[in-house]
Amino acid sequence: MKKSVRLLGCVLVLFCLLTGPVFAAAYRPFPDNRSISEVFDSIKVDGSYDRTRIRLITANDEAFYSRWKMVEDARETIDCTYCIIEKDIFGQSFIGLFVKKARQGVSIRLMIDGRVYRMPYMSKMPDKIEELAAFPNVQIKLYNSIRKSLVSVFTDYKKIVASNHDKIIICDGLVSIIGGRNIGADYFAQNGENDIVYNDSDVLMQGRHVAGQLKKAFDDEWKFNRNLVVKADAINFKDQLAKVELAYRVMTRYMQGGGLFDPEKVTDGKLKEALIEMNKEISAFKNISSYAAFQMFRGEREKPVKILDKHSHTGPLNGITPALIRMIEASRHEIIIQNPYLVITEAAEAALKRAADRGVSIIFHTNSAESTDSLFPQAFLMNDWKRLLQTMPTARIFVAPSQNERLHAKMFVFDGTIAVVGSYNMDPLSEDLNSEVVAAIHDKAFAQMTRLRILRLIEKKNIEYRIEVDERGKIIKTYGPEDHVNEKTVKKMNFMRKLQWLRPLI
């Protein structure tokens, strides 16, 4: 017995020695910063301000479970807006879930971005969504429909490309979720299960005041006069309702650990074909079969939370960019920015440079050309990264080296005190063109947890871009995109980064 205890003790000591430096490097206590607390206090929100039960979700399976469960549990109302609802098994089953809730009498408002809705890769999905629109308790709109926005082509072309980039679900005016994820396999699968797998982040919240703030953000975009109401087909040549309801049943059974339905028991030939295809698709996702044990909240406590909203280019409100810049200005110790696209605006860069001049540590975590889903932001980062490190000597830039580490999360941490999580990217597209929404959480424990998750992701397998300067500040050595990105892609980016007139649209 004593020998076993001694052996266990040696193992624990060895574990601490091996893991201790990593945890010690990642964890950093921060002194109170009154200035940054004052920034949070100065943010005005509609209605009464109170504390919110909140959970940070970074695991892809839990992100899907959260959305599914809150919609499944809804009894009265569902407000939902997404830029993309994919035509894969995740998107189809989600529409099938909405059909179920519509049959139960739940009032549903669904908004989808008008630019994505008619894309070729979304073929047949509009027909399925139009089936949902046939229910009298369901309203569906396309945000800033191209058909209606074309009137701006000669007056303000930016209004044509302005998108609703919010990702919001609000159920029964109580439970809500926002973040970076759309509805599709890319956001909920694990590495090796899908061609594209994102590292992303959401916040799941419970509280009527925050739900009310998000409803205000939703309503602002819902009322936009260039939205197009989606109506059911007057003549329905192909009934898509049975297919989305089948997708719902397939997903529910699989998530509960029940495996697949037997196609041989389906008598309808078209549905049998659809089931075979769905079984083949869902079988690839090995890590979404533990829904039965999932709990939305696991002892998370209430935190001070405020919603920051921003209209698209078609509206006047921008509550995000100025607040983030004020948080940068108020930081005294550390700023962490995790974002898939690092095309920093002049105002943000100036604020970050002033922070660096104060000695504030700045950590950027973003994509590289090898991991990104959009090459233009990486081309412009090629123009910027050396200057950023040269003018901000306290800054470090870490990039995801391959598609296995592809980043889509949008998180900020200021002095280990305030965390910001949502849909906002560090690029002109979010700053000027698209609607966005984020949650600002003023709580050291939550901010430290957010910080640690970012640093853990960086520690896994990321590349650091570096420069060395001489005594006069001249760059004499670098390690950057040209050192790890394939030559063909570098040539392409070298051409793209010359197109500076496109930068405001990236």
Where are these regions (language model features)?
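Bacterial N-terminal signal peptides
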Residues: 9-19
